[in-house]
Design a protein with these regions (language model features):
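A conserved catalytic-core segment of Leloir-type glycosyltransferases
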Residues: 1-47
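Acceptor-binding helix/loop patch of EC 2.4 sugar-transfer enzymes
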Residues: 21-28, 51, 73-110, 155
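An aromatic- and histidine-rich active-site surface loop
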Residues: 29-45, 53-78, 82-91
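Structural motif
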Residues: 54-55, 121, 179
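Membrane-proximal helix-turn-helix segments that form the acceptor-binding/catalytic region
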Residues: 64-67, 71-76, 103-122
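Carbohydrate-associated surface elements
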Residues: 128, 148-151
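Acidic anion/phosphate-binding donor-loop and adjacent secondary structure
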Residues: 134, 138, 143, 151-169
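Conserved donor-binding/catalytic core segment of Leloir-type glycosyltransferases
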Residues: 166, 173-182
């Protein structure tokens, strides 16, 4: 599909055409990952130049969005939240894809450090990941690192626990506002 804005359920979604970066060979994945940043910046500038966001959520992989995050954070004076799914490039070293002495490692490690610096908050998948990130990145303020798991165990609740709208009122969320759960 070409790059463009689509409507779905009342939400405007910017779809960006990219190279294949999943389930492909390492060369295509590498080139595609490096091109993502410029493809997203171009699409955002073309389709959402006048749109303002208060919060920018982004996840890893990829870690190659530094310029996108820096540009948008400055343009909108937005808060940024990194959802850290993979600790890259260390996981590539662990998988034997390249060594810590390689040019690729140094390049991606530099991008990783800059992404952490740009992020107002960093959500890690587990307490162990939080510890790892802080141990290997002493420049990060521990106050901005927290646990943000992919899922949580659901608690059984009785259907009649709360009256409709009670939680929204409790959280000071206007009932007329659209609510997104990510």
């Amino acid at each position: 599909q070409p790059t463009g804005v689509m409507e779905n359920g009342g939400a405007r979604i910017l779809k960006v055409k990219t190279l294949n970066i999943q389930k492909t060979n390492i060369v295509e994945k590498g080139i595609g990952t490096l091109l993502l940043e410029s493809q997203y910046l171009h699409a955002i500038n073309k389709y959402w130049r006048d749109v303002k966001f208060d919060l920018i959520l982004y996840s890893t992989p990829p870690i190659t969005f530094n310029k996108v995050i820096r540009t948008l954070k400055k343009r909108w004076n937005a808060k940024t939240y990194l959802m850290l799914k993979d600790i890259f490039p260390q996981n590539a070293v662990d998988l034997g894809m390249f060594s810590k002495k390689s040019f690729l490692y140094r390049m991606f490690r530099s991008k990783e450090e800059k992404l952490y610096e740009l992020s107002d908050f960093i959500g890690c998948m587990s307490p162990a990941n939080c510890e790892y990130v802080l141990k290997h990145n002493p420049a990060i303020d521990a106050a901005k690192v927290e646990i943000c798991p992919n899922s949580v165990k659901l608690q059984e609740r009785l259907k009649g626990d709360r009256k409709e709208g009670e939680l929204l009122k409790e959280l000071n969320i206007p009932a007329s506002k659209r609510i997104f759960i990510y």
